[in-house]
Amino acid sequence: HIRNMAFYNLPLRMLKLVQDSIDESQAIMTMEQAVWRMTGDQADWFGIDAGRIREGDRADVVVLDPTAFDQDLEQVHWADMENFSLERLVNRNPGIVKHVLINGKFAVRNEQLTTERGKEIGFGTFLRAK
């Protein structure tokens, strides 16, 4: 359903769960392992060349502020969908996602969507399986 596409925040919930387990001295994995599970591990499983930071690769990077994980990640609300007469459930967690780079271009900078996102070429590409 188009209304339910953007409200679960699984990656943020996983990172918070891991951080909470570390803070309670009962680590289920390291933070590095958690990030790997959501990036390189999944890329390997799907057979795509992604999920790693290497010289010469696309720069697909998300910069998070780990001190902002103290908020409720489960709070959802309704928001209007641009260009549609619909609303959708969203989960906004201010302060956590600082920057998002897609192919080296800022899609989010200082927690704000950039105006170039979706209008300029180079913000992404189809990733073929190996």
Regions found by a protein language model. Give the residues of each.
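Glycine-rich, flexible loop segments associated with nucleotide phosphate handling
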Residues: Q26-Q33, E87-G95, F126
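Cofactor-binding beta-sheet edge motifs in enzyme active sites
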Residues: L10-P11, R117-F126
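His/Asp/Glu-enriched, well-ordered alpha-helical/loop segment
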Residues: H1-Q71
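Residue-level detector of solvent-exposed, low-hydrophobicity positions
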Residues: L15, Q19-I22, Q26, G47, ...
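Ligand-binding pocket scaffold of soluble enzyme catalytic domains
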Residues: G51, K98-H99, F106, T125-K130
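C-terminal cap of metal-dependent C-N hydrolases
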Residues: V63-K119
